């Protein structure tokens, strides 16, 4: 369905089993007088994959940074399970049950793959720096548990064989999986993915799509992506941005047939699946 303004936000209140796990309400962001987002609203629901798409310059990256709490909007609010968020530091995301991956990956080149993933799992540790420094038995036990958790995630993503390797020695698609493993090791209830398919082959994107769908039994996913075939296949709902505004929101089938979306991507070319850049066919519900 088309939207010339942001979707109406649900009434404030305690999050329910079916209420949003993350909401952006009437968010506006400007940089030096340039409006990056204007009155944007969206909601990520439990066990849902929400896709965010739009042409280049539509405001997707800004929206992602707002959702992460790294950009504070000029107006509007970000609500995480009924808790209004302000500006966050990276280490605070895990405490809110959130994890993210970035286009730049952000891996530690001088740490092994396993140790990179342990960094993500570290939010579960209860022994502080002093306890670790003194090598208390409890600290040693927690270290073993964190490494076991990290190895389990590497196994889940099919990259356990790389545990002792270092990121610079790995192919780019494997490094992408390491970054995802680090995020999953935090055991989030909301996973934020920024362009996870960039640099992947068609077969690797298919594997990524299957993985993202498999995650929804234990978390929600917000996916910012420009590969339309992946978005249409894995997302339950899609929010479309253009020039910093929400122009459409709905199921993949609804978005694919929306005239405003077709115009934003293709100009006046509508309804021709063979046209360059045409939106791919999809099944209902992103399944």
Summary of predicted features, one role per range:
Residues 2-5, 13-287:
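Glycine-rich phosphate-binding loops of nucleotide-dependent enzymes
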């Amino acid at each position: 369905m088309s939207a010339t303004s942001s979707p109406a936000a649900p009434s404030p209140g305690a999050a329910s089993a079916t209420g949003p796990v993350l909401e952006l309400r009437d968010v506006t962001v400007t940089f030096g007088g340039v409006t990056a987002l204007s009155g944007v609203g969206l909601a990520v629901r439990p066990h849902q994959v929400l896709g965010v798409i739009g042409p280049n310059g539509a405001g997707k990256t800004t929206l992602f940074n707002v959702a992460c709490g790294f950009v504070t909007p000029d107006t509007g609010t970000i609500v995480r399970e009924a808790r209004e968020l302000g500006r966050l530091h990276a280490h605070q995301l895990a405490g809110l049950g959130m994890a993210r991956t970035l286009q730049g990956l952000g891996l530690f080149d001088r740490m092994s793959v396993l140790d990179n993933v342990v960094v993500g799992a570290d939010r579960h540790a209860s022994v502080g720096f002093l306890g670790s420094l003194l090598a208390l038995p409890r600290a040693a036990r927690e270290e073993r548990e964190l490494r076991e958790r990290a190895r389990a995630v590497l196994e889940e993503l099919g990259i356990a064989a790389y545990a002792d390797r270092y990121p610079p020695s790995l192919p780019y698609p494997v490094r992408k999986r390491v970054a995802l493993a680090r995020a999953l090791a935090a055991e989030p209830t909301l996973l934020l993915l920024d362009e996870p398919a960039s640099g992947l082959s068609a077969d690797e994107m298919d594997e990524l799509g299957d993985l993202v769908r498999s995650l929804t039994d234990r978390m929600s996913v917000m996916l910012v992506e420009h590969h339309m075939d992946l978005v249409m296949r894995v997302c339950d709902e899609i929010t479309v941005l253009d020039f910093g505004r929400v122009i459409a929101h709905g199921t993949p089938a609804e978005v694919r047939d929306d005239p405003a979306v077709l115009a934003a991507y293709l100009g006046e070319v509508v309804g021709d699946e063979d046209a360059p850049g045409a939106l791919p066919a999809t099944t209902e519900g992103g399944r």
